[in-house]
């Protein structure tokens, strides 16, 4: 029973706390009680808390270490997902194929049928004045909180999500004692359920599903949870660097 509790807690608790903070902010925003400064500060706080939970609960104890032979494939997967995530929203695509970019923003980002709040085709990629995503920019939050956003995205939530979705959820759909299911064993139904849930967890649901396919395939292909975490972390790192360099804080 003790092993069961530790396995569940280590895989689930950090993710639940992370998502819980998101829902809390949404509730405060709906009630008009969420000052702009709370967004970057809450992100920094949940980064520290969830990293601490992960280290304390040690869910990695039931997995072997990252295999060096899996690193090249993981890095390639991370780059591919980053490219697919970023390119549809790059300014040059709006100049070359504005209809394609408008379609992507209208139908491939939550909620389908309406433009996301950060997108206005008349002055994109600039954000609407005072948009909440700008609260993460160093000009407003300071470099410390902007870097914490990068660290949390690339080093904390990427790992937490992989341990939850690929380490726990994918196998739990097949057995309550999920740790007894081999990561490398493929189950079609479980795979696509995880892809769908993972995609819908993100506002960019189509890119999220593509990422779910790639990270899920990598996990099954290698049987290595750390390969998926490395790929996911690299994707988020590349995205964060692009956001800061380009000023497209709508991604955040």
Regions inferred by a protein language model and the residue ranges of each:
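Short, Lys/Arg-rich, polar N-terminal cytosolic tail immediately upstream
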Residues: 1-5
């Amino acid at each position: 029973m003790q092993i069961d509790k530790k396995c569940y807690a280590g895989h689930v608790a950090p993710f639940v706390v992370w998502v819980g903070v998101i829902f809390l902010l949404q509730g405060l925003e709906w009630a008009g009680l969420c000052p702009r400064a709370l967004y970057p500060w809450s992100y920094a706080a949940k980064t520290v808390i969830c990293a601490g939970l992960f280290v304390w609960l040690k869910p990695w104890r039931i997995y072997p270490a990252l295999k060096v032979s899996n690193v090249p494939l993981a890095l390639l997967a991370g780059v591919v997902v980053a490219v697919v995530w970023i390119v549809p929203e790059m300014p040059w695509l709006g100049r070359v194929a504005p209809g394609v970019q408008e379609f992507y923003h209208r139908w491939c980002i939550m909620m389908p049928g309406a433009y996301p709040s950060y997108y206005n085709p008349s002055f994109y990629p600039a954000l609407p004045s005072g948009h909440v995503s700008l609260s993460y920019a160093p000009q407003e939050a300071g470099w410390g909180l902007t870097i914490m956003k990068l660290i949390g995205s690339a080093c904390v939530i990427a790992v937490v999500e992989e341990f939850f979705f690929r380490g726990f959820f994918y196998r739990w759909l097949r057995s309550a004692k999920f740790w007894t299911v081999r990561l490398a064993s493929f189950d079609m139904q479980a795979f696509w359920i995880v892809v769908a849930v993972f995609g819908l967890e993100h506002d960019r649901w189509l890119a999220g599903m593509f990422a779910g396919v790639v990270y899920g395939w990598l996990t099954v292909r290698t049987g290595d949870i750390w390969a998926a975490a490395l790929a996911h972390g690299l994707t988020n790192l590349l995205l964060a660097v692009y956001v800061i360099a380009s000023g497209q804080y709508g991604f955040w």
